[in-house]
Design a protein with these regions (language model features):
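Conserved GNAT acetyl-CoA-binding A-motif
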Residues: 102-112
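Alpha-helical hinge/cap motifs
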Residues: 76, 83-87, 132
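GNAT-family acyltransferases
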Residues: 1-82, 99, 143-155
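Amphipathic alpha-helical recognition patches that constitute DNA-binding helices
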Residues: 3, 14, 74, 78, ...
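Short amphipathic helical patch at the helix-1/turn junction of helix-turn-helix
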Residues: 79, 113-114
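Conserved catalytic-core motifs of GNAT/GCN5-like acyltransferases
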Residues: 66, 111, 129-146
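Conserved acetyl-CoA-binding loop-helix of GNAT-fold acetyltransferases
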Residues: 85-99, 117-125
Length: 157
């Protein structure tokens, strides 16, 4: 069963691997954020994604008040490689949507690399709507990477 919950201290090394964190400064910044998971930390909110209490991923929710209106959130998730393509992403999107809509959000958006077919399927199976292509969003050593953007709206807010 898939759950979203605050991190346990003992999950630090596993979470570093899942999030592919490199460098001591980044590790320490993550250690601080992880210790405050389950609560807003500046404009970030992190939760552990677990399958029967085993850590399988990380959920990040962001709200930047200067760039987004109240009630609009951006969601990201990372799953360990062995857990991808098994429907976990779809379950996480549904759980997160339910939780953050209940907390008052009216809109949640997310994006993924245009070639990440598994995540695109997860967005669509979870009822999210494709908004468009974010052309050249990231520059990976001179190669521009396109992303596809999805969102879901709380029509009951």
């Amino acid at each position: 069963m898939i759950y979203l919950r605050p991190y346990k201290d003992s999950e630090f090394e596993s979470s570093v691997e899942i999030r592919e964190i490199k460098g001591e400064e980044a590790r320490e910044r993550w250690r601080g954020r992880m210790s405050r998971s389950g609560a807003w930390d500046d404009h970030y909110f992190h939760l552990a994604i677990t399958d029967d209490d085993a850590l399988v991923g990380d959920l990040q929710v962001r709200h930047c008040g200067q760039a987004m209106p109240d009630g609009a959130l951006e969601l990201g998730l990372e799953l360990s490689p062995e857990c991808r393509g098994k429907g976990i992403g779809t379950q996480v999107l549904k759980l997160a949507t339910e939780r953050f809509f209940a907390d008052g959000a009216h809109r949640i958006c997310g994006s993924t690399e245009i070639e990440n077919v598994a995540m695109i399927r997860a967005f669509e199976k979870a009822g999210w709507v494709k908004e468009g292509i974010l052309r050249g969003l990231f520059n990976d050593n001179g190669k521009l990477i396109d992303y596809v953007s999805y969102s879901i709206i709380n029509n009951n807010s």
